Structures are given as C-alpha cells and as structure tokens.
Swiss-Prot record:
It comes from the Bacteria. Part of the 50S ribosomal subunit. GO terms for biological process: negative regulation of translation; translation. The gene is rplM. Signal peptide: none annotated. This protein is one of the early assembly proteins of the 50S ribosomal subunit, although it is not seen to bind rRNA by itself. It is important during the early stages of 50S assembly. Keywords: Ribonucleoprotein, Ribosomal protein. Belongs to the universal ribosomal protein uL13 family. This is Large ribosomal subunit protein uL13. One of its GO terms (cellular component) is cytosolic large ribosomal subunit.
C-alpha cells in the first residue's frame, strides 16, 4: 500500500467568511486558525500550507467573557529606553479591533516561516463590507 503525499498542485483553496458580531474572541480566533492551517481538510499536511483564506467581518463587535476588558493587558516595547507600553483590551477594542483579532489568531498559528505564509491569508475588517465578495460564499455565524 502506498502512502499518499500531498503536493502543492493538489491543494484547492476556498474562502471562508466569519461574522464576529456577538461571538467570543477566542472562538472566532480558533475557527479562523483551523481554516487557515487546513485542519478541517482530510489532506491536512503539517509541512505544507494547505489552508484556506479567511475573512473576518464585524471585528468591532467581538465580545470577551469575564472581566477581560479591564484585566487583560497587551504589552509592547519600542526598543528604546523607557519605551515599554501597555494597553487594556477594552481600550484596544475601541481603537484597534483588527489588531486584537489578528493577535489572537497569530497566537494559534505555528511560529515559523510557514506560519507567516498561513497568516498572510487572514483578512480582518471592522464592518460588514469587504472587497472579497466575489471569492467568498456564505457567512459562518457559529462554529
């Protein structure tokens, strides 16, 4: 019996639209990561980028559970002395909701060059309008 090896030419990429309005941040990120990596496909292969494109709409309307809006803090450093900055999740959701979702999905993707390729297929938009209407089909409102 021969083992089937997936080739890059065998991979067919679909487009998935995820509506984040009223959904929990982690659930949206987990669903997006699953589609991006291709884990929903029977031909999933860890050493190839076999995932699909993912469009997340209504990023501004994503929710979080518990007291995370006040207690979860995102850290960054500019690299200069005194350049340490921290922001609460609630403030970031008001100013940069796209960053919050991209950061959550990035944490669920492998940290290597293939992960960078995978993350490039993620498209996040604040509202319902997106320029990928011709590629995408129906909207996934729940996982």
């Amino acid at each position: 019996m021969n083992t089937y090896t997936v080739k890059a030419s065998d991979i067919k990429r679909d487009w998935h639209v995820i509506d984040a309005s009223g959904r929990v941040l982690g659930e949206v990120a987990a669903e997006a990561a699953k589609y991006l990596m291709g884990k929903h496909k029977p031909m999933f292969c860890r050493n190839l980028d076999c995932g699909d494109y993912v469009v997340i709409i209504n990023a501004k309307k994503v929710t979080v559970t518990g007291n995370k809006l006040d207690q979860k803090i995102y850290y960054r450093h500019s690299g200069f002395p005194g350049g340490f900055r921290q922001e609460k999740l609630g403030d970031l959701l008001k100013t940069k909701p796209l960053f919050v979702i991209e950061h959550a999905v990035k944490g669920m993707i492998p940290r290597n060059t293939l992960g960078a390729q995978i993350l490039a297929k993620l498209k996040v938009y604040e509202g319902e309008e997106h320029p990928h209407a011709s590629q995408t089909g129906e909207v996934s409102k729940e996982s």
